[in-house]
Amino acid sequence: MQGHVTDQQTRLSEALKRRAAEEGFNPVGIARIPGSPRLQLRTKALQRWLDHGHQADMAWMAAPRRRDPRLLLDGANSVLAVGLNYYVDAQPSPGSLKVARYGWGRDYHRVVDQRLRRIGRWLSEQRPDCGWRACVDATPLLDKAWAEEAGLGWIGKHSNLIHPERGSWMVIGHLLTTEPLNADPPARSLCGRCSACIDACPTHAIREPFVVDARRCLAFHTIENREDDLPENIRAALGSWVAGCDICQDVCPWNHRSLPQSNDPDMQPRPWLLNLHKEEIQTWDDSVWEQKLRGSALRRIKPWMWRRNAAAAQPDPTPTL
């Protein structure tokens, strides 16, 4: 009887991953709850990070439910982890301000959530009695740790997930389910002695490997800081970044390989984001902001914050011939 159940689990597990691939997710993997001992170490590391105040004003990071997926879905047994590539081989035009790549396309929260829900409905058709919950990064879940547990990649020293063939340019999501599924092997860290991301951070926000202090992070300050003015040390280091920051990913050797480009329509850049200028942003009012950022994750940055960030940013010099 046990063998029969295991065969059923295997077939369902493989079918579920194929269904996720049909939604454009790659890589995909499965982890069993409560996870391996390494997952428990990640949970303890989160508490140390919180104890040191590295979360800055992001109080939601301390949500107790983040420590146990079963607090998000009663009876949860398994986690389907998925990655969605957003890498497009494009660069901002000379003299323009920079926006983090994840924000170039459609709001990934909506994209990933909608696709996960379709997978969840498919799962309900296969197992009518099972429960499930779609989770994107707004959900209190140790999302990168569970993605690592499911074999999608390892957490790099810059705290982003790295896949050996796809680099770190991917957003992730999870489908919690009460269905017992077959787990994939956890990913193994391949950062070795590399310190490129630590060395490149202009504000030394990566305090030590795997520990990012949001209080020093350009991405945090351009997206989450609700103060009228940015701190002086952030203004001095901002450079041309106006929404997020990709420096630690740009220098990562795993992103210097020949990476597959996303042909997903939802991940393609809005052209104006690659030709964004200081003077233009400083004239934005609410209506312009609404028109430009409809359906974008960058709506997290309110109009006055765009103007504040643009005032502090300095475009890279235009190359001369």
Swiss-Prot record:
It holds the Pfam family QueG_DUF1730. Its cofactor is cob(II)alamin; [4Fe-4S] cluster. Its EC number is 1.17.99.6. It is an enzyme of class 1 (oxidoreductase). [4Fe-4S] cluster 1 binds at residues 191, 194, 197, 252. [4Fe-4S] cluster 2 binds at residues 201, 217, 245, 248. Keywords: 4Fe-4S, Cytoplasm, Iron, Iron-sulfur, Metal-binding, Oxidoreductase, Queuosine biosynthesis, tRNA processing. It is found in: Cytoplasm. One of its GO terms (biological process) is queuosine biosynthetic process. Pathway: tRNA modification; tRNA-queuosine biosynthesis. SUPFAM superfamilies: alpha-helical ferredoxin. Disulfide bonds: none annotated. GO terms for molecular function: 4 iron, 4 sulfur cluster binding; epoxyqueuosine reductase activity; metal ion binding. Residues 179-211 form the 4Fe-4S ferredoxin-type domain. Binds 2 [4Fe-4S] clusters per monomer. It catalyses: epoxyqueuosine(34) in tRNA + AH2 = queuosine(34) in tRNA + A + H2O. The active site is at residue 137. Its main location: cytoplasm. The keyword Isomerase does not apply. GO terms for cellular component: cytoplasm. Belongs to the QueG family. Catalyzes the conversion of epoxyqueuosine (oQ) to queuosine (Q), which is a hypermodified base found in the wobble positions of tRNA(Asp), tRNA(Asn), tRNA(His) and tRNA(Tyr). Monomer. NCBIfam families: tRNA epoxyqueuosine(34) reductase QueG. This is Epoxyqueuosine reductase. It comes from Synechococcus sp. (strain CC9605). The lineage of its organism: Bacteria, Bacillati, Cyanobacteriota, Cyanophyceae, Synechococcales.
